[in-house]
Amino acid sequence: ALLLPFDDKRMVEYYEGFLMAVDSLKRTGTSIDLYVYDCNKESSSLNSILAKSEMKNMNVVFGPAQQQHIKPLAAFAKKNDIRLVIPFSSKEGEVFNNPFIYQINTPQSYLYSEVYEHFTRQFPNANVILLESAVVDKDKVEFIKGLKQELGSKGIPVKTLKENAPVETLKAALHNDKENFFIPTSGNDLTLLRIIPQLTLLVRDNPEARIHLFGYPEWQTYTKDHLESFFELDTYFYSSFYTNNLLPAAINFTQTYRKWYSKEMEERYPKYGMLGFDTGYFFLKGLSKYGSELEKNLPQMDLTPIQTGFKFQRVNNWGGFVNKKVFFVHFTKNYELIKLDFE
């Protein structure tokens, strides 16, 4: 069952992508009974849906979109042994005491340990220079603190400079025998605008040095503005979802979506049509293949996502699953775009 507010364009697009997943699976012989309910923000709307007799027999429910519906829907799912896939909200505590919940949009702090591990494995020979933002980015304090600890424990050198440090100071921090990573302590666009000019000069003046910029998921929303710089600065960022118009799977999906619906997906990150497809395909394929044994076989679910990857981990013995999948996206100096998948 899908429970979504269809007065929200994003949810309509999610549903459209989901239908494409259902169609793909039906073509391979999978039988699916799909129930779709328009669930607006009133609690009476949710209650009337949950009162329907067929709801108790669902194998999986996708939704809700509204924060206030999560608790009652999660309680219903738990009572009736139904998997609940929450694709949108990341600010949800229900997953910690409900074994039936799958949280797709992971709280950032859960991803940090994955990012640190991938970074130190991928770049054991790194020299990290943190560029301290003039304005503290509260969202990144925990990330930077954990990163410093992790790098320290792996013997990777870390230095902190002000974001407005002159090129000479940046140059003095370089190690010629290492991969030099500049990591700002803020993920916002203003910080990028401040640091890119100095780093660009540094790279041009020191062509022999191995210099990279490393950052955050939100950078994909600014890619259009900084594409040239991202390539020149050999940039990486981490994210649990990523797509671009150059990847074959994305091109195919976008063309099919256009053909089905005679429109483009909205320009936002993540793209909701792709999110609908990826979540629908993963869980419906998994249930058709493994049925009630799905949870035991999650690691065997080897699918190439269009945008959102999945790597589910139970949060504790009595809780549900969070998605700990992380990609690194790399803009190389050769103008290549590479999605690094670590699994």
Q: For the regions a protein language model found, what residue spans apply to each?
A:
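Extracytosolic ligand-binding ectodomains
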Residues: 1-343
